[in-house]
Amino acid sequence: MSSLPEAKLDVLLAHHASLEAESLGQLASERYVQITRELAEITPLIEAVKTYRSAVKELADTEALIADPATDAEMRGMAEAERDELAPRIEDLVQKIRVALLPKDAMDDRNVVLEIRAGTGGDEASLFAGDLFRMYERFASLQGWKVEVISASEGTVGGYKEIIAEVQGRGAFSKLKFESGVHRVQRVPDTETQGRIHTSAATVAVLPEVEDVDVDIKNDDLRIETMRAQGAGGQHVNKTESAIRITHIPTGIVVMMQDSRSQHKNRASAMNILRSRIYDAERQRVDAARSAERKEKVGSGDRSERIRTYNFPQGRVTDHRINLTLYKLPQVIAGEALGELIDALTTEHQAAQLAAQGAAA
């Protein structure tokens, strides 16, 4: 039977009891909200630990009964059946607790900056980028999250050449972080008269929304340019210099924002995206260094990595990182079955973390 860090479990149980006792006292509203949130987060783990310890005690009592020479054959048979039922239940609880004890990504509860760009495939790629955005928008709605478009460049026949949106909701990054990469679509375009299947692609980037304290950006490292916003064909669409282009000189990261008529709002949006991109670039650099010797199955999150194929003629979606195929393309692209892919990716990632812990032990 797999072992658990019993001393750590004792500390968690004591901490939970302390929080419950404190919650019954007179508290400032801010502290009450903080305690309530923490209790909601750790109570499922605490309940699993209590159930596990109760089952372990029950198993020990059962095995003692089986080993007792005074136990008659009928009672021993019943005890053996109970033991055979308890053992796998305890193993399941151990696995559940080990997963719950895994280190949490500090960004998991953050909002998300979602960037989708049409790749190879011309107009079809733009249409597919639009399909992906609506898929995430619907998925977010089902989670009770809010989606706000920050910037959008529409395709000539529909969809988007590029769209950037903020996904606001608790746990948004934890759910969407494995969506970064190249998404490929195979389907027959409406304009295709001979029924040939075309392949096109779009790139998705999921960045945790970060704050000033998360990223140190010096004013001297920024080059800020203002200009008049441009519409299709390059013509100027207003007479004031409301568009903003910000370059982070050390990294070369550039963000341009012109969707609002307000220069102040464009600058705030551009800085928000810039912070997230700088943080993400550093995060990827650190992750790459950590996994140089061990390639994780879930994938590196590299923007150039093809992660998923949506095959419309066959009605299937294949995630290449975990070799999972679902014949539920309409439900996935509608955002309704996307959670099945996300859950499978999360499980695979947790398994990789547990394996790494075991190798390090």
From Swiss-Prot:
GO MF annotations, alphabetized: translation release factor activity, codon specific
GO cellular-component term (any): cytoplasm
Chief location of this protein within or outside the cell: cytoplasm
Record-listed N5-methylglutamine modification sites: Q235
Post-translational modification: Methylated by PrmC. Methylation increases the termination efficiency of RF1.
InterPro entries listed in its UniProt record: PCRF, Pep_chain_release_fac_I, Pep_chain_release_fac_I_sf, Prokaryotic/Mito_RF, RF-1
Gene3D superfamilies in the record: 3.30.160.20, 3.30.70.1660, 6.10.140.1950
Subcellular location: Cytoplasm
Region feature Disordered, mapped onto this chain: 284-305
Keywords of the record: Cytoplasm, Methylation, Protein biosynthesis
Superkingdom, taxonomy of origin: Bacteria
Family: Belongs to the prokaryotic/mitochondrial release factor family.
Known role: Peptide chain release factor 1 directs the termination of translation in response to the peptide chain termination codons UAG and UAA.
HAMAP family: Rel_fac_1
Protein name per its UniProtKB record: Peptide chain release factor 1
Classification of source organism: Bacteria, Pseudomonadati, Pseudomonadota, Alphaproteobacteria, Hyphomicrobiales
